[in-house]
Amino acid sequence: MDAIKKKMQAMKLEKDNAMDRADTLEQQNKEANLRAEKTEEEIRATQKKMQQVENELDQAQEQLSAANTKLDEKEKALQNAEGEVAALNRRIQLPEEDLERSEERLNTATTKLAEASQAADESERMRKVLENRSLSDEERMDALENQLKEARFLAEEADRKYDEVARKLAMVEADLERAEERAESGESKIVELEEELRVVGNNLKSLEVSEEKANQREETYKEQIKTLANKLKAAEARAEFAERSVQKLQKEVDRLEDELVNEK
């Protein structure tokens, strides 16, 4: 009987110990479940942040694409301005050639009409005025060409900076892909994900700064194109004035030649 009682007591003690272990394991299981739920919540929060960053990156890409489109439009406008300047150069060159021929005829008429000193002096004065105007037009056209060269340089500089922005954007996308892979590993990767999110945020700020600079350059291009358009109008007006002056000089030369013929 004593042996049975001892065995019963031992079994009861073992049962109590087993129940204690079961309670302990159940508590540990609950704690593990709580930690797992917390980890899942943190992962969901991290994924939500990643989605938000992806949305911001999509917006940044759209804004960058729009800025590139505007820059292309400005480059086309600059090319059109260059074409107009070239056409204006050709228009000015023709009156200059006519002016040279008229000057030769005027010099001949002046030599033959030495007696008509008053008419010859007036023709010489007109010739000098036209020469001065021609030189002034050439100087202004040179200045306009220099401004166009500067505008092309600024456009090339803008392309280079936008290439740099595109490279940084590709780096950000690569960082995001790696961050998504690390997010799947659970709680141990959350700290690394948060650090990468901070890096992505800094890159987004850099993109925003680059976009703001691009907008500023766009406004500068608009002002330059407006200035070039005004200068083109002024140059065209000067060219028309030069053409009228050449026509007037041609008439004067014809008149002097007629007088010379009549005197002979």
UniProtKB/Swiss-Prot annotation:
Entry keyword DNA-binding: no
Superkingdom of origin: Eukaryota
Keywords: Acetylation, Allergen, Coiled coil, Muscle protein, Repeat
Signal peptide (from-to): none
Coiled-coil intervals: 1-264
Segments for region (Disordered): 1-56, 92-126
GO biological process entries: locomotion; muscle system process; regulation of muscle contraction
Gene3D superfamilies given in the database record: 1.20.5.170, 1.20.5.340
Transmembrane regions: none
Tissue localization of expression: Expressed in muscle (at protein level). Expressed in claw muscles.
Biased composition (Basic and acidic residues): 12-45
GO molecular function (one): protein homodimerization activity
Free-text domain note: The molecule is in a coiled coil structure that is formed by 2 polypeptide chains. The sequence exhibits a prominent seven-residues periodicity.
Family that this chain belongs to: Belongs to the tropomyosin family.
Subunit structure and binding partners: Homodimer.
Protein name: Tropomyosin Cha f 1.0101
